[in-house]
Curated annotation (Swiss-Prot):
Protein's gene: LMF1
InterPro entries: LMF
Lineage of origin: Eukaryota, Metazoa, Chordata, Craniata, Vertebrata
GO aspect biological process, one term: protein maturation
Transmembrane residue ranges: 43-65, 121-144, 201-214, 286-314, 361-382
Protein name: Lipase maturation factor 1
């Protein structure tokens, strides 16, 4: 009987127990499953933010490279050299601090005799830096500051061509992006530089102001936003409609009311979700990203909606965005898990002079943004709210808004030329110039170009609301068409006088445009638009008529090519 009792004692003592299991592998939980990222860190968020911002910068510099010479170059429609000279004269004829602060641009420091080359150099440098960040997902403060300075240098000499709200929005977003990164280190996961909470809240504050500003300007603006009828007109009258807008315009009335109510909810209510804890902040980010995707699908609003997605990404932490990154040993996601495990065990990066300096910089950034936000908040609270304005020359904190008023009908300026000797002769054959994207030929399908942007097409939409006296550049364009100017014609899709002598006369005609009805008679004829002439926009002009006009503005007189 002794033997069984001894065996029992051994079992109780654990002598017969198997060897304990090995600890879980790196990046695995206790059951061997892939470990989940913890909430509250932003290592992966920073990578997504930087890549998204770099993508928008890339598009912006690509637009600049393709169009700046024609718009603000040596022979552009509004030469930036003439603009800088006028600023210089205003401040006493020299490059003073006042001139620099009025129009901050590094072009002040370059040789103005080669302005086209200067503009190309700035755009190409921006394209190169943004491409590197987009591909690698890493950046430092030097590279991000370079992108910001380069784009600010273009915006501040771009005049009316760069007068849109998304230019300031990109500069504010880009300024915050500088402080996402370490000073010199080029690493996707710079261990000594965790993502600053100050910067993340700076982005959240930005998206809050963008959305709330857009919502308030609508409620305070056009009556149709209050009676829920604005979407009855928006798709047809927006600056550059796309093919999806053609079909959305014919949606049932109740769907348009639903769209308007949804817009008010997303712009006036959802922004406050940011301040209601992590889960509601994530809900806010998801709703805003989805909203911007819908806007991208339904219209060509340049890179505005793509840019608005960028600060929305700050609503997500590593636990939320982890699914975007592949798992596996040595992968970014695995490295972040290791960092989180080290922090759980109490391991912290040693406190150095660099970390102290960075903390000081982050504190200064928070104070600066808070101080510059005072007039912006007062503007939001004011019944006389102003949208898309800046209260400082560097455009660090700005006001935003979009579509405070909605036009009820679409009008277009159509440029035409004729080779007839007599412009007023009944048998004069007038031929239309076609732009890259704006409506012209009723049979041409609306374009789909977002996030790209044709600046001339967009300004032609505004010009149709005004007279040509308010838009001198359109007469400059007419003069260039009279000379078959190749540079100006590169902004257009079709020159009816290609391979022929230039026209003797150019005129502007004013038309009203309406979408044809899908399945209707005009659509069956291949027409996307129905147009009706309203009258002349500007009278027939010849090169001789414009000689004095060009001379008084110091524009080069167009000579036929």
């Amino acid at each position: 009987m002794a033997a069984p009792r001894e065996s029992l004692r051994r079992r109780k003592a654990g002598a017969g127990d198997p060897e304990p299991e090995a600890p879980p592998g790196q990046g695995r939980d206790l059951k061997g499953r892939p470990a989940r990222l913890r909430a509250g860190t932003f290592w992966l968020t920073r990578i997504v933010l930087l890549r998204a911002l770099a993508f928008v910068y890339f598009v912006a510099f690509l637009v600049a490279f393709h169009q700046n010479k024609q718009l603000i170059g040596d022979r552009g429609l509004l030469p930036c050299r003439a603009y800088l000279q006028s600023v210089q004269r205003h401040f006493g004829g020299r490059v003073s601090w006042d001139a620099l602060s009025y129009a901050p641009t590094i072009l002040w420091l370059l040789d103005w005799s080669h302005m086209d080359a200067n503009l190309d150099a700035l755009a190409l440098l921006g394209l190169g830096i943004s491409s590197f960040i987009l591909v690698s997902g890493c950046a430092n403060m030097v590279l991000m500051a370079a992108l910001w300075v380069l784009y600010m240098s273009l915006v501040n000499v771009g005049q009316i061509w760069y007068s849109f709200g998304w230019e300031s929005q990109l500069l504010e977003t880009g300024f915050l992006g500088i402080f996402l990164c370490p000073l010199w280190t080029l690493s996707a996961l710079p261990r000594g530089t965790p993502t600053s909470w100050v910067v993340m809240w700076g982005f959240r504050w930005l998206i809050f102001r963008i959305m709330l500003g857009a919502g308030l300007i609508k409620i305070r603006g056009d009556r149709c936003w209050r009676d829920l009828t604005c979407m009855d007109f928006h798709y047809e009258t927006q600056p550059v409609p796309n093919p999806v807008a053609y079909f959305l315009h014919r949606s049932p009335w109740w769907f348009h009311r639903f769209e308007t109510l949804s817009n008010h909810f997303l712009e006036l209510v959802v922004p406050f979700f940011i301040f209601l804890g992590r889960r509601m902040c994530i809900v806010h980010g998801a709703l805003q990203v989805l909203f911007q995707v819908v806007l991208i699908i339904s219209g060509n609003l340049s890179f505005l909606n793509w840019l608005t997605i960028v600060p929305s990404l700050a609503c997500f932490d590593d636990a939320t965005l982890g699914g975007l990154f592949p798992s596996g040993p040595g992968r970014l996601k695995d490295q972040v898990l290791k960092i989180q495990e080290e922090e759980t065990r109490g391991a912290r990066a040693p406190r150095t002079r660099g970390s102290v300096a960075r903390g000081t910089v982050n504190l200064a950034l928070g104070i600066l943004v808070a101080w510059l936000s005072i007039p912006v908040v007062l503007n939001l609270l004011s019944p006389r709210q102003v949208m898309n304005s800046s209260f400082n020359p560097l455009r660090i904190v700005n006001t935003y808004g979009a579509f405070g008023s909605i036009t009820r009908e679409r009008t277009e300026v159509i440029l035409q030329g004729t080779a007839s000797a007599n412009a007023s002769a009944p048998d004069s054959a007038w031929e239309d110039y076609e732009f890259k994207c704006k409506p012209g030929d009723p049979r041409r399908r609306p374009c789909l170009i977002s996030p790209y942007h044709h600046r001339l097409d967009w300004l032609m939409w505004f010009a149709a609301f005004q007279t040509y006296e308010h838009n001198e550049w359109i007469i400059h364009l007419a003069g260039k068409l009279l000379a078959n100017d190749a540079q100006a014609l590169s902004l257009l899709a079709r020159n009816p006088f290609e391979g022929r002598d230039p026209p003797r006369w150019v005129r502007g005609e004013h038309y009203r445009y309406k979408f044809s009805r899908p399945g209707g008679r005009h659509a069956a004829e291949g027409k996307w638009w129905i147009r009706r002439r309203l009258g002349p926009y500007f009278p027939p002009l010849s090169r001789q008529d414009l000689r004095g006009y060009f001379t008084s503005r110091q524009w080069p007189y167009p000579e036929p090519e």
